[in-house]
Each structure stands twice: as structure tokens, then as C-alpha cells.
Amino acid sequence: MTLEHIVDMYGSSIGKHLVSRRVEMNNEGPFKGVKTYRIELWDADSHEIIETVERTAHITLETKGCIMEALELGIIRKMFEHYASK
């Protein structure tokens, strides 16, 4: 199940959300070649970031999917924690 499916399933009960995924490559200094994988959960009504999870590492194409999957699980957990605390 993808993060979009989770947001679609629970969005009506916990508010509308947008999900953004970004990969940033550091091309300077001692961390040249390091990528930061980031997923942000946005509140669609207020246009504010609710939660962010990220992972920084030297990554090969074979492991990229595993990292994004782990980040999606992390943001799903944070999404439910955020609304459970309200």
C-alpha cells in the first residue's frame, strides 16, 4: 500500500493532505555525492508542513526504493501520531 493510498483512505477523517518527495544531491565540500531523501506531509488547507522525515546517505539506485519505503512508513506513523495527540 502506497502513502497516497493511506492518505486517500484516512484523509476525510484526519484532514486533507498533500505529500511531497524530494531528493537533493550535495555537490560541494566533503559531502559531495551525498543524497538527502525527504518526504513531507502537508496540510492542504493551511499549506503548512505537518511532518517531515528524511535520510541522508551515499545511495545506489538499488537501495533508493528501500529508503523511500522506510521514509513512507515513518511519515505514516507520524501522521497518525499527529492526529492522535489532538
Model-derived regions: residue spans:
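Negatively charged, low-complexity tracts enriched in Asp/Glu with abundant Ser/Thr
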Residues: 1-24
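Generic early N-terminus positional signal peaking at residue ~5-7
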Residues: 3-7, 30, 84
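Generic short N-terminal amphipathic or hydrophobic helices
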Residues: 5-6, 13, 38, 48-49, ...
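Intrinsically disordered, low-complexity segments enriched in Ser/Pro/Gly/Ala and basic residues
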Residues: 11-12, 19, 35, 45, ...
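Active-site metal-binding core of divalent-cation-utilizing nuclease and nuclease-like domains
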Residues: 26-28
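Short, aromatic- and cysteine-enriched interfacial helices/patches
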Residues: 30-31, 76
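A short, structured beta-strand/loop element
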Residues: 31-55
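Mixed-charge, Lys/Arg-enriched low-complexity segments
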Residues: 51-86
